[in-house]
Amino acid sequence: MTPRGFSCLLLPTSETDLPVKRRT
C-alpha cells in the first residue's frame, strides 16, 4: 500500500482523501 493511501485511512480529512475517493 502506498503511503498516500495509508495516510488517507488514518487521516480521512487529509487532501489525499480527495484523489482516493475519486479512485474508488
From Swiss-Prot:
Induction: Down-regulated 6 hours following staurosporine (STS) treatment and up-regulated 24 hours following STS treatment. Down-regulated 6 hours following beta-carotene treatment, returning to its basal level 24 hours following beta-carotene treatment.
Primary location recorded for the protein, binned into one broad class: secreted
Pfam families cross-referenced by the UniProt entry: Humanin (PF15040)
InterPro entries given in the database record: Humanin (IPR028139)
Cellular compartment(s): Secreted; Cytoplasm
Tree of life domain: Eukaryota
Tissue: Expressed in skeletal muscle and testis.
Keywords recorded for this protein, A-Z: Cytoplasm, Secreted
Any one GO BP annotation for this protein: negative regulation of execution phase of apoptosis
Molecular function as annotated in GO: receptor antagonist activity
Gene Ontology cellular component list: cytoplasm; extracellular region
Entries under PANTHER family matching the protein: HUMANIN-LIKE 1-RELATED (PTHR33895:SF18), HUMANIN-LIKE 4 (PTHR33895)
Record function comment: Plays a role as a neuroprotective and antiapoptotic factor.
Family the UniProt entry places it in: Belongs to the humanin family.
Name of this protein: Humanin-like 6
Protein encoded by which gene: MTRNR2L6
